[in-house]
Amino acid sequence: MSPTQPNPAAALSGSAEPQTKRIYISNLDFSTTEEELEQFLQEFRVVSVLIPSQTVRGFRNSTVRPLGIGYADFASAADALQAVENLNGKQLRERTLKIKMYVPYSPRARAERRKEKRKVPAPQAEENPDAAPQDAQQPQPPAPAEEPTSKDTVYCAYLPSKVTDVELREFFADYQPQDIYVYRTNGSRRKVYFHRRFTAALVTLGGEAELANAIETLGTRRLMGKKITLRPARLSKVEEVQHAAARKLELEQIQQQTRQIAEHAMAMEEHRQQEAEIPAAETPDDVAATA
């Protein structure tokens, strides 16, 4: 089921009343179905449920693997908020769910938030400008704003090119790994003509303590024989990767539907041609005329 798109402006507004009717659910068990999740949410007038998945293409075959996340739309924004308040932290299939209001990814809104964080008011001199110290008359350059980081998600850089979520889940097994996103990104160095692609991943762990312990303990270890980099993930990167994964899934579903329609049309055309090639049955008059 494809949920309707919420209003981004309303979802990003700072009003006390929630505007979006959609919620975001993570840490789902990979075997959870949309029917089970809808049953889990039915008390709050759920309208539609979507559990994204991705197609992993191998040399001989392809497998469909859920992303461990889900989206749900409700009859009203109040129902969505009640679902978050009552079900966040509850268990489904022995997995503790993380549920929050859905906020659409918006590069423009993120840029505006960064711009606001960098704004630092210039120091104002007192009523007598001559008596103000020299340092107070010269505005100080704003300190670079640190981008907020996640409290439970680790950013893994410079991973082996063939790594999958299976190896990462085993690598972080002692720290309750949950959502795992593996992706390829472009790397570059300023003032040097050097570009390369490297493999990175975002791994959501059990909590803040697990994140700190994993970085401290695993930061010096090798994964598949390669030294990697671990640090807390930026919240903007987490949102970007999650929405990119969801968008990729939507495109794959559209392509699959297009292929199915084309295959059906081709089959119908072949059937029509075969029917046209079958000779018509002879009537008694035709038999008599032949005799």
Curated annotation (Swiss-Prot):
Alphabetical keyword list: Repeat, RNA-binding, Transcription, Transcription regulation
Gene Ontology MF terms = mRNA binding
Segments for region (Disordered): 109-151, 271-291
Pfam families cross-referenced by the UniProt entry: RRM_1
- Asked if Amino-acid biosynthesis is a keyword of the record, the answer is no
**PROSITE patterns cross-referenced by the UniProt entry:** RRM
Q: Which SUPFAM superfamilies did the record assign?
A: RNA-binding domain, RBD
Task: Give the domain of life.
Answer: Eukaryota
The RRM domain sits at 21-104, 152-235
Question: Which Cys residues form disulphide pairs?
Answer: none
Question: What is the protein's known function?
Answer: May be involved in the modulation of rDNA transcription.
**Protein family membership:** Belongs to the RRT5 family.
The protein in question is named Regulator of rDNA transcription protein 5
